[in-house]
A protein has these predicted regions:
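N-terminal binding-site loop/beta-alpha segment at the start of enzyme catalytic domains
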Residues: 1-73
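Proline-rich low-complexity regions
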Residues: 9, 80-81, 100
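Active-site mouth loops of central-metabolism enzymes
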Residues: 16-28, 78-88, 119-121
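Solvent-exposed, non-transmembrane amphipathic alpha-helical segments
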Residues: 33, 62-65, 79-80, 126-129
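Glycine/proline-rich, positively charged
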Residues: 35, 85-129
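Acidic active-site catalytic centers that drive phospho-/nucleotidyl reactions
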Residues: 46, 78, 107
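Structural motif corresponding to the early beta-alpha repeats
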Residues: 51, 67-87, 112-115
């Protein structure tokens, strides 16, 4: 079954701009937001390593993946060109993202900020393989 079929409502929770407290992500508030979202039948979440300097992924782990069964939500992450220089850098980066998010897989994995120049970089380093 496609992950598209698992998205319950056509609205997603982007984890790019999160509640802050004392210069850090306010996980207490974020957990409340995640709970509110899930309780209303929404289940699609979107993050990227660059959001909050990698801490958005940690927030996913602390407020979503450690608190809800994996099959209850759909999670998207992204490959950002600034985090790899060679093809060999891509897999360790991907595995770090899985670990930081506390999951074994992503439902969707996007090439972040596509443009012609970055498309060529992704192709050159076999990111589409």
């Amino acid at each position: 079954m496609s992950a598209f079929n698992e998205v319950k409502k056509n609205f997603g929770f982007g984890l790019m701009r999160l509640p802050m407290k004392d210069g850090k992500i306010d996980n207490v508030e974020l957990c409340k937001m995640v709970d509110f979202f899930m309780e209303r039948g929404f289940n699609y979440f979107d993050t990227a390593h660059g959001y909050h300097n990698g801490l958005s992924e940690v927030a996913v782990r602390e407020c979503l993946s450690s608190r809800y069964p994996r099959e209850s939500y759909v999670l998207t992450n992204k490959l950002s060109s600034s985090y790899f220089k060679t093809q060999e850098d891509i897999r360790p980066y991907f595995e770090l993202q899985l670990k930081e998010c506390g999951v074994e897989y992503f439902d969707f994995y996007l090439m972040h900020a596509q443009d012609k120049r970055l498309f060529e970089k992704y192709k050159k380093h076999n990111a589409y393989e």
